Amino acid sequence: AFDSIMDPIMGFISDNTRSTWGRRRQYVFWGALLMGFAFAMLWQLYRENSVAYNFTYVMVWSFVFYLGLTIFGVPYVSMGYEMSDDYHERTSVMAISQWIGQWAWVIAPWFWVIMYDPAWFPSADEATRSLSIWVAVVFTLCAIAPAVFIKGESTKDRSDYEPLDFRGILGSINKIAKNFVEAFSSPPFRKLCIATFLIFNGFNTVASFTYFVIRSHLFNGAAPGVWPTLFGSVGAIVTTFIVIPIVARMAKTMGKKR
């Protein structure tokens, strides 16, 4: 719900920003910093605190994190599409972006092994607090890289942009609502939305039960060791090195629609 409100607002702000830095870079930079800081703070939890306190703490920092994600993510995606006017080159840009992003799914499952290894950390609680800081620092640096290295044209003197005020933001939301109703009246668009909904929700639902399926059905409830980690990591490696290049190639040769 928070994203559904903030994303179109952030899109309007980014699209109509007048700046010597362009429309995207500054938001990618500051959004990455906010997101990284909030991620590190989000996991600084202690068992001795009350359930109500920890719940409130996580909820507040989650909102801050997703605010940073919105500030970063909306301009970042737009920046990727604006890097080229060529139809197929944009496909290559998005494929490379997805390829790099998949490495998070290759690496992240191994955190479970590190967290519960006493040679690394005395407890999983301490591991969570420490790892969150390291992850935040490393990936914040990665996230600000597009803002530093991808150059954008100055929009300081653009006169065709709408003013960044409350009336302009409210008007953009009304336009988005009208465009959504118009787009959703198209049968192909509805099919695409339904397919996307089923695919993403199906994937996330099944993925959340993976550990329990492996432990219950393969190990009869015993500790599964590194097998859940291998399942997630190997699956991500297959996607990274096989699926993404093949799909990108098919999109160029057969067309995205087919």
Q: Language model features by range: what are they?
A:
Residues A1-R258:
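Membrane-embedded alpha-helical bundles of multi-pass transporters/translocases
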